[in-house]
């Protein structure tokens, strides 16, 4: 199964608006306790999250919010703790070199279930400037207008 396929739980639609995504990587997430149950229920938010490589060479997912499981007891998990991502050493070494360049960031694009395991698709993105965002919106609007005109013409 290619990377990014599976049952999509959460998607970061704002990432393609804020970043030029140059490359994507599939990573596993280290979860504790009832976190997987909350993910399967779809109670996860990746809107404000990002990934970072720490000094030990491990990739951490920061600000990922997984809501507490309703049927969980007092041993429920912390919703916003940082979670370790599982990548191959070669991929981590490549990401270390790329993220040290100015303007690059690791952005989670979507969380999905693949063969029963929670995976995250992270993208290596370069931040867009304000004029880039405006240009994308103009192109999107022009495409929408053309499609609408073609549809009206076909009637």
From Swiss-Prot:
Coiled coil stretches, renumbered: none
KW Cytoplasm (keyword) present: yes
Assigned keywords, A-Z: Cytoplasm, RNA-binding
Keyword RNA-binding tagged: yes
Cellular location(s): Cytoplasm
InterPro entries: SmpB (IPR023620), SsrA-bd_prot (IPR000037), SsrA-bd_prot_CS (IPR020081)
GO molecular function terms noted in the UniProt entry: RNA binding
CDD domains assigned: SmpB
Superkingdom to which the source organism belongs: Bacteria
Pfam families, per the entry: SmpB
GO cellular component: cytosol
GO biological process, one term: trans-translation
UniProt main location, coarse: cytoplasm
Region (Disordered): 132-155
Sequence similarity: Belongs to the SmpB family.
PANTHER family assigned: SSRA-BINDING PROTEIN, TMRNA-BINDING COMPONENT OF TRANS-TRANSLATION TAGGING COMPLEX
Function recorded in the entry: Required for rescue of stalled ribosomes mediated by trans-translation. Binds to transfer-messenger RNA (tmRNA), required for stable association of tmRNA with ribosomes. tmRNA and SmpB together mimic tRNA shape, replacing the anticodon stem-loop with SmpB. tmRNA is encoded by the ssrA gene; the 2 termini fold to resemble tRNA(Ala) and it encodes a 'tag peptide', a short internal open reading frame. During trans-translation Ala-aminoacylated tmRNA acts like a tRNA, entering the A-site of stalled ribosomes, displacing the stalled mRNA.
Protein name listed in UniProt: SsrA-binding protein
